[in-house]
Protein backbone atom coordinates (compact mmCIF):
# COMPACT_ATOMS: atom_id res chain seq x y z
CA UNK A 1 0.00 0.00 0.00
CA UNK A 2 1.90 3.12 1.17
CA UNK A 3 3.97 4.90 3.80
CA UNK A 4 3.46 8.50 4.92
CA UNK A 5 6.31 11.00 4.67
CA UNK A 6 5.00 12.92 7.68
CA UNK A 7 5.79 11.54 11.13
CA UNK A 8 2.77 9.63 12.40
CA UNK A 9 1.89 10.07 16.06
CA UNK A 10 1.09 7.04 18.19
CA UNK A 11 -1.11 7.57 21.24
CA UNK A 12 -1.20 4.81 23.85
CA UNK A 13 -4.30 4.73 26.04
CA UNK A 14 -4.96 1.86 28.41
CA UNK A 15 -2.39 -0.26 26.60
CA UNK A 16 -4.05 0.35 23.21
CA UNK A 17 -2.00 2.09 20.53
CA UNK A 18 -3.74 4.43 18.10
CA UNK A 19 -1.95 5.66 14.99
CA UNK A 20 1.38 5.13 13.29
CA UNK A 21 2.23 4.11 9.76
CA UNK A 22 -0.15 1.66 8.04
CA UNK A 23 0.71 -1.78 9.38
CA UNK A 24 2.87 -0.50 12.24
CA UNK A 25 0.16 -1.23 14.80
CA UNK A 26 -2.91 -3.45 14.48
CA UNK A 27 -6.15 -1.66 13.66
CA UNK A 28 -8.15 -0.72 16.76
CA UNK A 29 -11.72 -2.01 16.81
CA UNK A 30 -14.29 0.04 18.71
CA UNK A 31 -17.52 -1.68 19.69
CA UNK A 32 -20.69 0.16 20.71
CA UNK A 33 -22.83 -0.77 23.71
CA UNK A 34 -26.04 0.70 25.17
CA UNK A 35 -26.94 2.37 21.88
CA UNK A 36 -30.53 3.38 21.12
CA UNK A 37 -32.88 0.38 21.28
CA UNK A 38 -30.09 -1.97 22.35
CA UNK A 39 -31.89 -5.16 23.32
CA UNK A 40 -29.94 -5.62 26.54
CA UNK A 41 -31.20 -2.25 27.87
CA UNK A 42 -34.59 -2.18 29.61
CA UNK A 43 -34.59 1.46 30.76
CA UNK A 44 -32.51 3.92 28.72
CA UNK A 45 -33.12 6.82 31.10
CA UNK A 46 -32.07 5.02 34.27
CA UNK A 47 -29.44 2.81 32.64
CA UNK A 48 -30.99 -0.50 33.64
CA UNK A 49 -29.72 -3.41 31.56
CA UNK A 50 -29.05 -7.13 31.51
CA UNK A 51 -25.60 -7.26 33.08
CA UNK A 52 -25.05 -10.95 32.34
CA UNK A 53 -25.82 -10.44 28.65
CA UNK A 54 -23.59 -7.38 28.52
CA UNK A 55 -20.69 -9.25 30.09
CA UNK A 56 -21.14 -12.14 27.65
CA UNK A 57 -20.92 -9.74 24.72
CA UNK A 58 -17.84 -8.09 26.17
CA UNK A 59 -16.10 -11.39 26.87
CA UNK A 60 -16.70 -12.46 23.27
CA UNK A 61 -14.77 -9.41 22.10
CA UNK A 62 -11.95 -10.11 24.54
CA UNK A 63 -11.72 -13.70 23.26
CA UNK A 64 -11.60 -12.62 19.63
CA UNK A 65 -8.88 -10.12 20.43
CA UNK A 66 -6.87 -12.88 22.08
CA UNK A 67 -7.32 -15.04 18.99
CA UNK A 68 -6.47 -12.40 16.38
CA UNK A 69 -4.16 -9.89 18.04
CA UNK A 70 -6.49 -6.98 17.30
CA UNK A 71 -6.87 -4.38 20.08
CA UNK A 72 -10.28 -3.15 21.16
CA UNK A 73 -12.04 -0.22 22.80
CA UNK A 74 -15.62 0.15 24.01
CA UNK A 75 -17.94 2.99 23.07
CA UNK A 76 -20.39 3.60 25.92
CA UNK A 77 -23.53 5.46 24.87
CA UNK A 78 -25.93 7.04 27.33
CA UNK A 79 -28.84 9.43 26.95
CA UNK A 80 -28.99 10.72 30.53
CA UNK A 81 -26.32 11.49 33.14
CA UNK A 82 -27.78 8.74 35.33
CA UNK A 83 -27.62 6.08 32.63
CA UNK A 84 -24.13 6.82 31.35
CA UNK A 85 -22.72 6.86 34.88
CA UNK A 86 -24.30 3.49 35.53
CA UNK A 87 -22.86 2.05 32.31
CA UNK A 88 -19.38 3.39 33.06
CA UNK A 89 -19.54 2.06 36.62
CA UNK A 90 -20.36 -1.40 35.27
CA UNK A 91 -17.67 -1.33 32.62
CA UNK A 92 -14.78 -0.24 34.83
CA UNK A 93 -15.91 -2.86 37.32
CA UNK A 94 -15.43 -5.75 34.88
CA UNK A 95 -12.42 -4.34 32.99
CA UNK A 96 -9.70 -2.40 34.79
CA UNK A 97 -7.63 -1.36 31.79
CA UNK A 98 -9.41 -1.04 28.44
CA UNK A 99 -10.07 2.50 27.22
CA UNK A 100 -13.63 3.58 26.49
CA UNK A 101 -15.42 6.31 24.59
CA UNK A 102 -17.99 8.38 26.47
CA UNK A 103 -20.71 9.18 23.98
CA UNK A 104 -24.14 10.75 23.90
CA UNK A 105 -26.28 12.84 21.59
CA UNK A 106 -26.54 15.36 24.45
CA UNK A 107 -23.63 17.58 25.45
CA UNK A 108 -24.67 17.75 29.08
CA UNK A 109 -24.53 13.96 29.29
CA UNK A 110 -21.03 13.85 27.80
CA UNK A 111 -19.98 16.55 30.25
CA UNK A 112 -21.45 14.62 33.18
CA UNK A 113 -19.57 11.51 32.04
CA UNK A 114 -16.25 13.39 31.83
CA UNK A 115 -16.81 14.75 35.31
CA UNK A 116 -17.77 11.33 36.66
CA UNK A 117 -14.70 9.66 35.14
CA UNK A 118 -12.56 12.27 36.86
CA UNK A 119 -14.29 11.70 40.20
CA UNK A 120 -13.81 7.92 40.17
CA UNK A 121 -10.25 8.02 38.84
CA UNK A 122 -10.66 6.52 35.36
CA UNK A 123 -10.23 9.68 33.26
CA UNK A 124 -6.93 8.33 31.89
CA UNK A 125 -8.94 5.63 30.07
CA UNK A 126 -11.79 7.87 28.93
CA UNK A 127 -12.01 9.26 25.40
CA UNK A 128 -14.48 12.12 24.99
CA UNK A 129 -16.70 11.64 21.94
CA UNK A 130 -16.66 14.18 20.57
CA UNK A 131 -15.33 17.67 20.09
CA UNK A 132 -17.35 18.92 17.13
CA UNK A 133 -18.76 22.08 15.58
CA UNK A 134 -21.91 21.95 17.72
CA UNK A 135 -20.09 21.75 21.07
CA UNK A 136 -21.34 24.33 23.57
CA UNK A 137 -19.35 26.38 26.04
CA UNK A 138 -20.81 24.56 29.04
CA UNK A 139 -19.42 21.25 27.76
CA UNK A 140 -16.08 22.87 26.94
CA UNK A 141 -15.85 24.25 30.48
CA UNK A 142 -16.51 20.89 32.14
CA UNK A 143 -14.14 19.05 29.81
CA UNK A 144 -11.41 21.62 30.49
CA UNK A 145 -11.81 21.20 34.24
CA UNK A 146 -11.84 17.39 34.02
CA UNK A 147 -8.85 15.05 33.91
CA UNK A 148 -9.88 13.65 30.52
CA UNK A 149 -6.95 14.10 28.13
CA UNK A 150 -8.12 12.18 25.02
CA UNK A 151 -10.94 13.03 22.66
CA UNK A 152 -12.40 12.22 19.30
CA UNK A 153 -12.21 15.36 17.15
CA UNK A 154 -14.97 15.20 14.55
CA UNK A 155 -14.26 16.48 11.04
CA UNK A 156 -17.94 17.01 10.23
CA UNK A 157 -18.62 20.10 8.15
CA UNK A 158 -22.37 20.64 7.75
CA UNK A 159 -21.95 22.91 4.73
CA UNK A 160 -19.06 21.20 2.95
CA UNK A 161 -18.65 17.39 3.01
CA UNK A 162 -15.58 17.46 0.78
CA UNK A 163 -12.06 16.69 1.91
CA UNK A 164 -11.34 20.43 1.95
CA UNK A 165 -14.42 20.98 4.11
CA UNK A 166 -13.16 18.44 6.62
CA UNK A 167 -9.76 20.09 6.76
CA UNK A 168 -11.37 23.51 7.19
CA UNK A 169 -13.52 22.44 10.14
CA UNK A 170 -10.43 21.01 11.84
CA UNK A 171 -8.17 23.99 11.14
CA UNK A 172 -10.26 27.17 10.90
CA UNK A 173 -13.77 26.32 12.11
CA UNK A 174 -17.18 26.85 10.56
CA UNK A 175 -20.78 25.81 11.22
CA UNK A 176 -20.98 28.35 14.04
CA UNK A 177 -17.47 27.81 15.40
CA UNK A 178 -14.84 30.53 15.02
CA UNK A 179 -11.97 28.17 15.83
CA UNK A 180 -10.83 24.93 14.29
CA UNK A 181 -11.81 21.81 16.18
CA UNK A 182 -8.17 20.90 16.83
CA UNK A 183 -7.65 24.29 18.48
CA UNK A 184 -10.80 23.81 20.58
CA UNK A 185 -9.50 20.41 21.66
CA UNK A 186 -6.14 21.91 22.65
CA UNK A 187 -7.84 24.60 24.73
CA UNK A 188 -9.86 21.88 26.48
CA UNK A 189 -6.62 20.30 27.64
CA UNK A 190 -6.78 17.43 25.17
CA UNK A 191 -3.31 15.95 24.74
CA UNK A 192 -4.43 13.07 22.53
CA UNK A 193 -6.66 14.30 19.67
CA UNK A 194 -7.99 11.39 17.64
CA UNK A 195 -9.64 12.45 14.39
CA UNK A 196 -12.96 11.04 13.18
CA UNK A 197 -13.39 11.74 9.46
CA UNK A 198 -17.21 11.91 9.82
CA UNK A 199 -18.46 9.18 7.48
CA UNK A 200 -21.05 10.45 5.00
CA UNK A 201 -23.78 8.47 3.18
CA UNK A 202 -23.28 6.88 -0.22
CA UNK A 203 -24.00 9.48 -2.87
CA UNK A 204 -23.54 12.35 -0.40
CA UNK A 205 -19.84 12.36 0.38
CA UNK A 206 -18.82 8.72 0.87
CA UNK A 207 -15.99 9.06 -1.63
CA UNK A 208 -14.63 12.11 0.17
CA UNK A 209 -14.91 10.20 3.44
CA UNK A 210 -12.53 7.50 2.23
CA UNK A 211 -10.22 9.94 0.45
CA UNK A 212 -9.97 12.00 3.62
CA UNK A 213 -8.42 9.08 5.53
CA UNK A 214 -4.96 9.20 3.86
CA UNK A 215 -5.26 12.94 3.25
CA UNK A 216 -5.81 13.85 6.91
CA UNK A 217 -3.21 11.35 8.12
CA UNK A 218 -0.73 12.79 5.66
CA UNK A 219 -1.50 16.38 6.67
CA UNK A 220 -1.81 16.15 10.45
CA UNK A 221 0.05 12.95 11.36
CA UNK A 222 -2.65 12.11 13.90
CA UNK A 223 -4.62 8.89 14.41
CA UNK A 224 -7.57 8.75 12.01
CA UNK A 225 -10.74 6.69 12.02
CA UNK A 226 -14.50 6.80 11.84
CA UNK A 227 -17.83 5.07 11.94
CA UNK A 228 -17.73 3.85 8.36
CA UNK A 229 -20.52 1.32 8.87
CA UNK A 230 -22.89 4.31 8.89
CA UNK A 231 -22.34 4.56 5.14
CA UNK A 232 -24.02 1.18 4.74
CA UNK A 233 -26.78 1.75 7.29
CA UNK A 234 -27.71 5.07 5.64
CA UNK A 235 -27.85 3.59 2.13
CA UNK A 236 -31.50 4.07 1.08
CA UNK A 237 -31.37 1.59 -1.78
CA UNK A 238 -30.00 -1.18 0.42
CA UNK A 239 -32.53 -0.51 3.18
CA UNK A 240 -35.34 -1.01 0.69
CA UNK A 241 -33.74 -3.90 -1.18
CA UNK A 242 -32.93 -6.05 1.86
CA UNK A 243 -36.59 -5.96 2.90
CA UNK A 244 -37.47 -7.79 -0.32
CA UNK A 245 -35.05 -10.62 0.45
CA UNK A 246 -35.64 -13.76 2.56
CA UNK A 247 -32.57 -13.05 4.73
CA UNK A 248 -32.13 -9.27 5.07
CA UNK A 249 -29.17 -9.56 7.43
CA UNK A 250 -27.25 -11.76 5.00
CA UNK A 251 -27.71 -9.05 2.38
CA UNK A 252 -26.72 -6.22 4.71
CA UNK A 253 -23.73 -7.51 6.69
CA UNK A 254 -21.18 -7.75 3.84
CA UNK A 255 -21.72 -4.06 3.09
CA UNK A 256 -21.51 -3.15 6.77
CA UNK A 257 -18.20 -4.98 7.25
CA UNK A 258 -16.98 -3.94 3.81
CA UNK A 259 -17.11 -0.22 4.54
CA UNK A 260 -14.63 -0.76 7.36
CA UNK A 261 -12.23 -2.73 5.20
CA UNK A 262 -12.17 -0.07 2.49
CA UNK A 263 -11.26 2.58 5.06
CA UNK A 264 -8.74 0.27 6.72
CA UNK A 265 -6.82 -0.31 3.50
CA UNK A 266 -6.80 3.47 2.99
CA UNK A 267 -4.97 3.88 6.30
CA UNK A 268 -7.65 4.15 8.99
CA UNK A 269 -6.12 3.54 12.43
CA UNK A 270 -9.37 2.66 14.20
CA UNK A 271 -12.83 1.51 13.20
CA UNK A 272 -16.02 2.37 15.07
CA UNK A 273 -17.66 -0.81 13.85
CA UNK A 274 -21.06 -0.34 15.47
CA UNK A 275 -23.09 -2.76 17.60
CA UNK A 276 -20.94 -5.14 19.62
CA UNK A 277 -23.17 -7.96 18.34
CA UNK A 278 -21.22 -7.73 15.06
CA UNK A 279 -17.99 -8.71 16.80
CA UNK A 280 -17.76 -12.17 15.21
CA UNK A 281 -18.01 -10.80 11.69
CA UNK A 282 -15.65 -7.85 12.06
CA UNK A 283 -12.61 -9.31 13.84
CA UNK A 284 -11.55 -11.98 11.29
CA UNK A 285 -12.14 -9.61 8.36
CA UNK A 286 -10.08 -6.79 9.85
CA UNK A 287 -7.34 -9.23 10.89
CA UNK A 288 -7.12 -10.38 7.26
CA UNK A 289 -6.52 -6.83 6.02
CA UNK A 290 -4.04 -6.19 8.84
CA UNK A 291 -1.98 -9.11 7.56
CA UNK A 292 -1.82 -7.40 4.16
CA UNK A 293 -0.90 -4.10 5.78
CA UNK A 294 1.74 -5.80 7.92
CA UNK A 295 3.34 -7.48 4.90
CA UNK A 296 3.44 -4.16 3.08
CA UNK A 297 4.88 -2.37 6.11
CA UNK A 298 7.78 -4.82 6.16
CA UNK A 299 8.46 -4.24 2.46
CA UNK A 300 8.44 -0.46 2.98
CA UNK A 301 10.83 -0.62 5.92
CA UNK A 302 8.27 0.18 8.61
CA UNK A 303 9.10 -1.44 11.93
CA UNK A 304 6.07 -3.28 13.32
CA UNK A 305 5.72 -2.28 16.97
CA UNK A 306 4.80 -5.69 18.40
CA UNK A 307 5.61 -8.16 15.65
CA UNK A 308 4.94 -11.28 17.71
CA UNK A 309 1.35 -10.32 18.48
CA UNK A 310 0.53 -8.60 15.18
CA UNK A 311 -1.89 -10.55 12.94
CA UNK A 312 0.83 -10.75 10.27
CA UNK A 313 2.75 -13.08 12.62
CA UNK A 314 0.06 -14.45 14.89
CA UNK A 315 -2.27 -15.64 12.12
CA UNK A 316 0.11 -16.79 9.38
UniProtKB/Swiss-Prot annotation:
A GO MF term: tetrahydromethanopterin S-methyltransferase activity
Q: Name one GO biological process term.
A: one-carbon metabolic process
Q: Which residues form the signal peptide?
A: none
Tell me which domain of life the UniProt entry assigns to the organism this sequence originates from: Archaea
Q: Does the keyword Translocase apply?
A: yes
Q: Which reaction does it catalyse?
A: 5-methyl-5,6,7,8-tetrahydromethanopterin + coenzyme M + 2 Na(+)(in) = 5,6,7,8-tetrahydromethanopterin + methyl-coenzyme M + 2 Na(+)(out)
**Which protein family is named in the record?**
Belongs to the MtrH family.
Q: Which NCBIfam families match?
A: mtrH
Q: What is this protein called?
A: Tetrahydromethanopterin S-methyltransferase subunit H
Gene source species: Methanosarcina mazei (strain ATCC BAA-159 / DSM 3647 / Goe1 / Go1 / JCM 11833 / OCM 88) (Methanosarcina frisia)
Query: Quick one: which gene encodes this?
Result: mtrH
